[in-house]
C-alpha cells in the first residue's frame, strides 16, 4: 500500500483520503488518460455495458463541470464530425470539448432553458445529470438535497427529451427514492439502478438509467 509523504500535521481524515487516492487504480487511469475527472470512467463503464451513447446524438449534460463526461460523450458520439450536439451546463466555468456548447448558469433560469433549446434545434436524445449537492457531512441531509437535484433533472428532461429518449442521473440509495422512481417509471419504459466499478464500494452513490421516454401525456394515456 502506497502512503503519501509528509503526513505529519494532517488530520486523520485527510491522511485516509490521500492514501485512498494513491492506491486507487481509477485515479491513476484518470490522470494517465488526461481525463478531467474519475466520473468520466464511470460514464464509460456504464456505456460499455448498456450502449446508450451513439454517434451524432443530441445530448444535454447537467452539472457538466469539470468536463469528464463531456470528454467521453464527444468521443463516443463522434461530435468532432460536426453532426449531433452536446450542450453542457454548470454553475462553474467549464472548458468546452469538440462539438459542445457550454453554458454557465442555473437550469432553474427560464432563459437558460430557452438557450439550451436553441442549441439543440429540436429535442435531445439523452439527458445526463451528474449533479450532486455540496455535502454537509450529515448523510440524510445530503441525500435529500441530491434527490432534489434529481427531481429537477427529471423536470428538465420533460422539457427537452425526445420520444424514446434516455435519461441517466446520479442518485443516492435511501428512503426518498421511491417517489422519484415512481416519476421515472411513469415516464420511461425501463428504469435500472447502475453501480459502475469506478464508483467506490463504500459510497452510497448509484445511477438511474431510464430508457424509452414517453411524453407525459402519452404516459398518462398508457396507464388508462
Stretches found by the model and what they are:
Residues 57, 84, 165:
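Glycine-centered, small-residue-biased loops immediately flanking beta-strands
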Residues 1-55:
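Class I SAM-dependent methyltransferase Rossmann-like catalytic core
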Residues 80, 161-166:
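Short glycine-dipeptide loop
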Residues 147-163:
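A short glycine-rich, Lys/Arg-flanked "PGG" loop and its adjoining helix->strand segment in the class I
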Residues 66-81:
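Conserved SAM-binding loop of SAM-dependent methyltransferases across substrates and taxa
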